[in-house]
Amino acid sequence: MTLALQYKRILLKVSGEALMGGQSFGIDVSVADRIAADIAEVRAIGVEVAIVIGGGNIFRGVAVASHGGDRVTGDHMGMLATAINSLALRTSLTKLGVETVVLSAIAMPQICESFSQRKAIGYMNQGRVVIFAGGTGNPFFTTDSAATLRAAEIGADVLLKGTQVDGIYSADPKTDPTAKRFDRLTHVEILQRGLSVMDTTAVTLARENNVPIIVYSIHEKSGLAKVLNGTGRFTIVSE
């Protein structure tokens, strides 16, 4: 059995920084289009796809708190940034003919629909790509935690995190040439080793709900399809 068949329904977590490309801020449309093409490729082979996008290319809530501001307000601003990114990726997917809907944890009816579990599953059963905006809708939670929560809610077979590198390393491979890449880890090992691939809340939630995690490079063309076919470079996290 191929991974594409094993993983019928996936949730893809994309960082906001991934959308910047070579820019220092904002959205590089060509990057959004390439990520959309990768998603369309796996959708074409029957994989049901949901997506959570971060907002770090536009705003990070912790930035407000670090300058003495209110963290809750900062996180609300970050949630709005995820909505901007979600609309951008929906635009890129729509250009490819992929039916896509944005569901937000924060009500904004003129812009997108509000999230509900039943609605999300219904759209996925219809073959649409679903993008979840607004994080969890609550402050103090990362979009990694939101991705894990949504993966559990929709019954995703796996949570895929597209990052800047091709898996989980013992240290930052960009600064430490001795960093070792892991092929496989457990959720507990990530927590025990203090590996920074996801925050503790996200990893714990994934472990408690039996959600496996695959970490791969978002920058490789057709990288998502390669991972699902078992031919790419990645780290898989499962018990």
From Swiss-Prot:
Activity regulation remarks: Inhibited by UTP.
GO cellular component: cytosol
Disulfide bonds: none
Domain of life: Bacteria
Binding residues for UMP: G55, D75, T136, G137, N138, P139, F140, F141, T142, T143
Keywords (A to Z) from UniProt: ATP-binding, Cytoplasm, Kinase, Nucleotide-binding, Pyrimidine biosynthesis, Transferase
Pathway as given in its UniProt record: Pyrimidine metabolism; CTP biosynthesis via de novo pathway; UDP from UMP (UMPK route): step 1/1
GO BP of this protein: 'de novo' CTP biosynthetic process; UDP biosynthetic process
SUPFAM superfamilies noted in UniProt: Carbamate kinase-like
Gene Ontology terms, MF aspect: ATP binding; UMP kinase activity
EC identifiers of the protein: 2.7.4.22
Top enzyme class: transferase
Protein localization: Cytoplasm
Reaction(s) catalysed (UniProt annotation): UMP + ATP = UDP + ADP
Annotated positions binding ATP: K13, V14, S15, G16, G56, R60, T163, Q164, Y169, D172
Principal location listed in the UniProt entry: cytoplasm
CDD domains: AAK_UMPK-PyrH-Ec (cd04254)
Job of this protein: Catalyzes the reversible phosphorylation of UMP to UDP.
PANTHER family with a match to the protein in the record: URIDYLATE KINASE (PTHR42833), URIDYLATE KINASE PUMPKIN, CHLOROPLASTIC (PTHR42833:SF4)
Quaternary structure and interacting proteins, as annotated: Homohexamer.
Entry's family note: Belongs to the UMP kinase family.
Name of the featured protein: Uridylate kinase
The organism of origin for this protein: Bartonella henselae (strain ATCC 49882 / DSM 28221 / CCUG 30454 / Houston 1) (Rochalimaea henselae)
Organismal lineage: Bacteria, Pseudomonadati, Pseudomonadota, Alphaproteobacteria, Hyphomicrobiales
